[in-house]
Amino acid sequence: MKRLILLIITCYGLLLGYANTDTASDSLLQMLQTLPHDTTRLSTLNAIIKIEQNNYKCIQYSDTLMLEALKLKNDKYASLAAYYHLLYYYNRCEQDSVAKWIVKMEPLVQKSGLWDYFFDARRFQIDLYTFTEQYELAISEANKMKQKALDIDNNRGMVAAYQCLSNAYIGSQRWDEGLKALEEAYRLLPKNGNAVVRISVLSQLISVTKEMKDNNRQLKYLQELENVLCKFIIDNPSLKDGFADVFIFNEIFYAHYYLNTDQPQLAYSHIEKSKKYLTENTYFMYKVLYYDIYAKYYQSIKQYQQASAYIDTTLTMLKKDMTRNWNLPLHSEAFENKRRFS
């Protein structure tokens, strides 16, 4: 159960903002064939990788971007190519590959100055330490990252370091310290800073306060996340589909809040709202959360047969996806609930 909570908390914010559309990718690939080997071509490759980031084509195009960027001595795009490799391997929990690309990325970033991306990459690496229960190593590395960010006056690095500290504390059952670190990350967020970073921190805060049964704080952060999302989509309407998973998350955790405060009908309305964001491309963890909240709703109104059916669906998805994609044993709340109804 502990590792499942960590997976939920650490995965938010890493797959944001890019709709995976074959049409957009095909159009850019056609354009790529006609472009000269200059920065325009590098920019187009970069755009293709963002679309293809969740499949193996990401690695193929990132390799091409790295080779062509190095040939042109373009440290910016070489740094980004390393970052995309890191993100791909992080999402597959491949610790050695992440470590290899951190080593390759750092000297490139020292030339390009893309420290925000580097600190994001370090966050991936440290969160994998936490996920594999190397908590003291994660805390030590997060403190090193915090000092490095302080030395070069990088806000993104400071925020990421506190996020990592929070995850490590929570993983080792130091919940109060974890919440304190996460609230420090929240305090450090610039008022008009990167919306994706704010969404990531708020999502973690919502997850943690829900697990701690702190309903008042959970509602506060849910309302802020909703406001941030709405403003971001108004300013960037073309990215709405790419943020569908975050909308699902927000509606599901509103439902948790209302179930925890004995308001099942309001919870149900948010579960229904979340349904419209589900697609075949929805990240599997969000699908699990969707079916799990339905089970909890039916438990709350004592319709145990329906609850059991949704728990079965949740268990099937966990067995199929988590053991395959994350190499995890199945120890979940859904399993405990299923035993209760058996």
What are these regions (language model features)?
Residues 4-13:
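Sec-dependent N-terminal signal peptides
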Residues 17-342:
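A "functional boundary" signal
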